[in-house]
Amino acid sequence: MENSTTTISREELEELQEAFNKIDIDNSGYVSDYELQDLFKEASLPLPGYKVREIVEKILSVADSNKDGKISFEEFVSLMQELKSKDISKTFRKIINKREGITAIGGTSTISSEGTQHSYSEEEKVAFVNWINKALENDPDCKHLIPMNPNDDSLFKSLADGILLCKMINLSEPDTIDERAINKKKLTPFTISENLNLALNSASAIGCTVVNIGASDLKEGKPHLVLGLLWQIIKVGLFADIEISRNEALIALLNEGEELEELMKLSPEELLLRWVNYHLTNAGWHTISNFSQDIKDSRAYFHLLNQIAPKGGEDGPAIAIDLSGINETNDLKRAGLMLQEADKLGCKQFVTPADVVSGNPKLNLAFVANLFNTYPCLHKPNNNDIDMNLLEGESKEERTFRNWMNSLGVNPYINHLYSDLADALVIFQLYEMIRVPVNWSHVNKPPYPALGGNMKKIENCNYAVELGKNKAKFSLVGIAGQDLNEGNSTLTLALVWQLMRRYTLNVLSDLGEGEKVNDEIIIKWVNQTLKSANKKTSISSFKDKSISTSLPVLDLIDAIAPNAVRQEMIRRENLSDEDKLNNAKYAISVARKIGARIYALPDDLVEVKPKMVMTVFACLMGKGLNRIK
């Protein structure tokens, strides 16, 4: 490494840092093979899939010196030196520089290298501003902020008090934040920080990656961080119903001879692509394989709009789509005419004609998702061969685990807990996060061969179980790699819970000078803290029935952060089920507001789910110890 950096000028180092930041989509400080693959896809480089894989494999083989499946900035610098004279480097640099509409700003964060540049997309900013303006135009709490001007930097200033972010989170995942916990009037720097903590910890709880974002970054309106977080929040809302268990009409997208189980493994992006192609096939038009290169001429969109527009009758009054714009010779004008037709359906959000013609994949994906949510135009087939038992949605516990993993920035994103863990890649990433070393040379990585691919995944799962038993010292009695690969829910959850538990306890051990923390220590600390604050509540275990009132949690928050809890919001006597739920909603939101990263749901407190209850008290203990320090 020493030798390779001596020949790099400061200017070149800055250029490389900028390139690295563009590829490092999740801001993890590392670039994974998935991010490299995404880069080629996003750049709309007309390369066949095998060529992309070849280049990615070459890059990893050259750059990944410690074989951990990802590239650090130092490894990236070495790589670019090594590839300088080769064709692959030219291709690679061409892709990085191909991202247009990019505004570069100097890096100011204390963790960013001196002189780095973070870039953000002007198009994304405009699209998000217009979407938020429309979504919150009638919210009285946002009157002082909305409408924002899409053509200046008002977005970054308007998000600085945390109110808009909290509102957007609730739009994407209703009831995530208890509105009573949002500070709305006479804001001070402290109450603004509380709002931003509430937004960040709530975003984390719905599966957004927030590992490198702090309240101060949002307060300062750092564009690349703000836009990255906003996109994640908006995407959660756009994709909420693109899920077969929540929208059975999607079964209509089954291909000839395909099992429902296979369709259920598809990500929302893949389902959207299939939905578009379903309608294009019905229109007699050729199918597409992406939301960038293939939609640039707008013609597929014209046919899609014509297929999904109401025809009268049950769908409501007919809306006629004018297809004459297909014959327009100018791409930009054709895209403009197409968006005029989309506007008839009330769905021209997210893209401008230029975004369509440039093939902006993120904004075109959002445009299509919004079309799907408004006019899916699918009818559930009357097919008796389909096993409807498969359509049971995920449990609240499964969703919590999935959101926890995604919030930590695992790659790939987990859409379906069991099928997306079938190759154990994400489990290995979680092991690393709980400080269980993974020997990446033992791990098979995608793309898996068509023949024997599942064996490669099972080998990974066997290694994951072996690490759990021998290195992490988990209790994994009766669990084999095949159970993970097949998505055995009970056994997979047993491993995932132990990963989450260890992660939570590690945070506490770090605060307590490394001493091992267990349930007894947490319970003892909770009771001592409650007693020293003269509270009447206490808990005997994480199964204590009094937890269903949420009063021990609220009293503990008050002991740790006096004045955070507004006592008039709490019911203490003769609690109905509704009162208990309201207390729980308030408790979870106020805990997040004081900085506790809690993934549990209000129902976990009301129903006294001991595992999730433990994580709530552990996170609050972490917050309490942090304050003392």
Swiss-Prot record:
Stretches for region Actin-binding 2: 381-625
GO molecular function, one term: actin filament binding
Positions annotated to bind Ca(2+) 2: 64, 66, 68, 70, 75
GO cellular component: actin filament; actin filament bundle; brush border; cytoplasm; cytosol; extracellular exosome; plasma membrane; stereocilium
UniProt KW keywords: Acetylation, Actin-binding, Calcium, Cell projection, Cytoplasm, Deafness, Disease variant, Metal-binding, Non-syndromic deafness, Phosphoprotein, Repeat
Oligomeric form and interacting partners: Monomer.
Purpose of the protein: Actin-bundling protein. In the inner ear, it is required for stereocilia formation. Mediates liquid packing of actin filaments that is necessary for stereocilia to grow to their proper dimensions.
Protein name per Swiss-Prot or TrEMBL: Plastin-1
Species: Homo sapiens (Human)
